[in-house]
Amino acid sequence: MKKVLIIGGAGFVGRYLAEYLTGECGYEVSITKMKQEVLEYADADILDMDLLAKEEVEQVLAKCAPDYIFHLAAQSSVALSWSNPQLTVDVNIKGTLNLLDVLKEIKYPGRVLLIGSGEEYGYVNPEEVPISEDTVLRPGNIYAATKGCQNMLAAIYARAYQLNLVMVRAFNHVGPRQSPQFVVSDFCKQVVEVEKGLREPVIHVGNLKAKRDFTDVRDVIAAYECLVRQ
């Protein structure tokens, strides 16, 4: 049985990924979370790990000895990246650098999936659509910049230390159980509150001129599994 490690598995995507990997895929799964997070999952080994503490990363990888690693841990809120840029840089860049350093030091032979973001592209000229991996990155917020930096660091480590790293730029996810921090779930929550008479019949929205691709989270995690396996 193949063993996998999900780093940062207490979030929206991580929970779906854990269910899919233990269920349909039949992997032996370990999941890391922050100490203050609550995560109960009978079919996986749950481990507390601070990504900013390199020694904890070393201990977890030694304990789990995974064949595949899914690196989901991130500060993923664009709004929070503006109000707390230091946290965003620490988690998304310094935390990932800790992981990369440990992978280098132990000469990790397995495959690692690092999750970037469609936000990295930023402003895209109409003539550049449809975009590809070669489209110029013009990140327009701090979160996007940290994700771009994460993936550039990973590319350097992959070449310099022969690490098997796969990087994706995932666009917006949607699905049941998503936090109202995100746009679709926020709109849905407001609609339900209006229908229940809990608020005035007005939906508060942000910039409606932005165009984004949305993917069901269940399709996203199936694609992630394919990327580490094939």
What are these model-predicted stretches?
Residues 7, 32, 69-73, 112-118, ...:
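SDR active-site strand-loop-helix element
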Residues 26-36:
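Conserved glycine-rich Rossmann-like NAD(P)H-binding loop of the short-chain dehydrogenase/reductase
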Residues 53, 68, 95-98, 135, ...:
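Conserved cofactor-binding/catalytic machinery of classical short-chain dehydrogenase/reductase
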Residues 4-24:
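N-terminal Rossmann NAD(P)H-binding glycine-rich loop of SDR-like oxidoreductase domains
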Residues 83-98, 111, 119-167, 174, ...:
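Catalytic helix-loop patch of NAD(P)-dependent Rossmann-fold dehydrogenases
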